Amino acid sequence: MDADINRIQQEIRSINSDTVNKIRGTLDLLAEIYGQVNWSIYELVENSDNVGSKNVVFELDGNRLSVINDGLRFTGEDFERICSVNTSVNRDSLVDRSFGLGFKSVFNFSNDVSIFSGNNGIRFFEESGLPLWKIFPHVVDCLDLKSEQSTVFKFVLGNKRKRIADVLVGISPEILLFLNSVESLTVRDVQNNNTLLLEKSSKPLDGMNTNLVTVKSSTNKETTESSEYVCYSKDFSIPERVRIGENSETKVIVAVPVSGLNDSVSVFRNIYRVTGEEKTGFMLSGEFVTTMNFDGIVDNDWNSWLLDSVLGFVNSELKLRTRK
């Protein structure tokens, strides 16, 4: 369904000054929460995964970045979320890092953002002079998208070009372990004629929700790194005493390197590394509640229950399986 951009524009224009100030305050807080460029890149990867993309491409061309995915196209509701802000978010709340809020982290590296999906094209740019320029959509002609392109994001980088390039070439192939649909991630630098390709392949093993997953990294078609993991996917029933939302189950993925299991652990909130060093021991990913800037796990009943449940699984069932 196409988005009604004109209606969205009218609604934003009708916002009173007090609400405008609240929205701007929330946007400033989000800019602080998502202050690191690598988080913005991870948000774009996660958003692509959430819409079922198998292939994601980051293309640097001069001072512009394009991000292309082949998942589901934007719905009208998606456009509305992009053009709105939940002003109830505050520093002490459990931040909703879902599509719409996390996406606004892109304004940390670009003040000129365009989105093309389906028959719609919109642009947000600071030079418009609007107080709510980060959520006010300007209609632009949609691109003639190729068959393998569902959604294209375009960003003008300003002085952040080098920082973005450094983050992109430093993406670890291990993040693919925790994505549901993305199988390949390409970073293409047109100016320097360099291409980085991260790929994931998997095959089922004996046992429920267990796969042997291979992730590899190639630079200009030459493989530079390849690793194998046994990945266990486990759904845990959430006791009412720690339940945060309406969900009665939560999913956790445990990745064990085939090269061997040791006692060190890295904890991820989805694809964000929160604790632990890269490539040490096993890795686990789940809906952990983190500090605002992802640098630690909050000390609360939810995290205690989830960690105890996962580590209990690792110490019993998982270790027994890896000995077989």
Question: Would you name each region that the model predicts?
Answer:
Residues M1, S110, I115-K324:
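GHKL/Bergerat-fold ATPase module
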